[in-house]
């Protein structure tokens, strides 16, 4: 199990990225012709997800393309550096979460797509999402619900074009999802030698059953469509 010290370090690292992007936005605003324009703070931003969103709509000039390339490079370097600093146990947990969440996304792709499509028709803040997820997880202690939630939130992050909002959502939701139940599940699954079993992982996940996954789908859909 990760120590609280390590968890705080990871969160602080992500917060540094968040603050850096906010500073970039403020710097860009200072060079904008409309100097009266006030950029919204991350916590006040409203999420709008649309599966038809095309990144080319946001990259209309050569400067836009170059800025995106630089932003991607800097973000990737910082994330790669963070990964290199993580201990072996943390990396083993990353591998487990990758395997499990990829399987959920693949096996329940149709149900997940319904959730994503419904999310694209609504606007909501990161705190709306967090409150709903917190309610779901308090009422349900199963691993399936938590895996489905991680997969859903990750996909929302892919569809959200604003990096500040995405990091804000990931940071807050990681605290909510990683409750005692989820930590117990992951530490129980993780083998003592920190290797990932190839066959037992798939069979173990099948035992979770479709009920837990569909409950998360139902609850999230019910919230999205009001």
Curated annotation (Swiss-Prot):
Sequence similarity = Belongs to the orthopoxvirus OPG045 family.
Function, as annotated: Plays a role in evading host innate immune response by inhibiting host inflammasome activation. Interacts with and inhibits NLR-mediated interleukin-1 beta/IL1B production in infected cells. At the host mitochondria outer membrane, interacts with the BH3 domain of host BAK and prevents BAK from binding active BAX. In turn, host apoptosis is inhibited.
Protein's name in the database: Apoptosis regulator OPG045
Query: In which broad location class does this protein mainly occur, judging by the first location in its UniProt entry?
Result: host cell
Q: What quaternary arrangement does the UniProt entry report?
A: Homodimer. Interacts with host pro-apoptotic protein BCL2L11 (via BH3 domain). Interacts with host NLRP1. Interacts with host BAK.
GO biological processes: regulation of apoptotic process; symbiont-mediated suppression of host apoptosis
Where does this protein reside within or beyond the cell?
Host mitochondrion outer membrane; Host cytoplasm
What Gene3D superfamilies does this protein's entry cite?
Blc2-like
**What does the induction field say?**
Expressed in the early phase of the viral replicative cycle.
Q: Does the keyword Signal apply?
A: no
**One GO cellular component term noted in the UniProt record for this chain:** host cell mitochondrial outer membrane
Which keywords accompany this UniProt record?
A: Host cytoplasm, Host membrane, Host mitochondrion, Host mitochondrion outer membrane, Host-virus interaction, Inhibition of host apoptosis by viral BCL2-like protein, Membrane, Modulation of host cell apoptosis by virus
Any Pfam family from its record, for instance, is M11L
| High-level lineage | Viruses, Varidnaviria, Bamfordvirae, Nucleocytoviricota, Pokkesviricetes
UniProt KW Membrane keyword: yes
């Amino acid at each position: 199990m990760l120590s609280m010290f390590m968890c705080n370090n990871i969160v602080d690292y992500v917060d540094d990225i968040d603050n850096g992007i906010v500073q970039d936005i403020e710097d860009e605003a200072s060079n904008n012709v409309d100097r009266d324009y006030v950029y919204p703070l991350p916590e006040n931003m409203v999420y709008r997800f649309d599966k038809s969103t095309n990144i080319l709509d946001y990259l209309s000039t050569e400067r836009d393309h170059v800025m995106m390339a630089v932003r991607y490079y800097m973000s990737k370097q910082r994330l790669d550096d963070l990964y290199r600093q993580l201990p072996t146990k943390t990396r083993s947990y990353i591998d487990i979460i990758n395997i499990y969440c990829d399987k959920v996304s693949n096996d329940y792709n149709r149900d997940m797509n319904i959730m994503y499509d419904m999310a694209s028709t609504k606007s909501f803040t990161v705190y709306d999402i967090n409150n709903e997820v917190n309610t779901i997880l308090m009422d349900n202690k199963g691993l399936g619900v938590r895996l489905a939630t991680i997969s859903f939130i990750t996909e929302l992050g892919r569809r959200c074009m604003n990096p500040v909002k995405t990091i804000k959502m990931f940071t807050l939701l990681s605290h909510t999802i990683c409750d005692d139940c989820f930590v117990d599940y992951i530490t129980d699954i993780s083998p003592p030698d920190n290797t990932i079993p190839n066959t037992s992982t798939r069979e173990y996940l099948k035992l979770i059953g479709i009920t837990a996954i569909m409950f998360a789908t139902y609850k999230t859909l019910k919230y999205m469509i009001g």
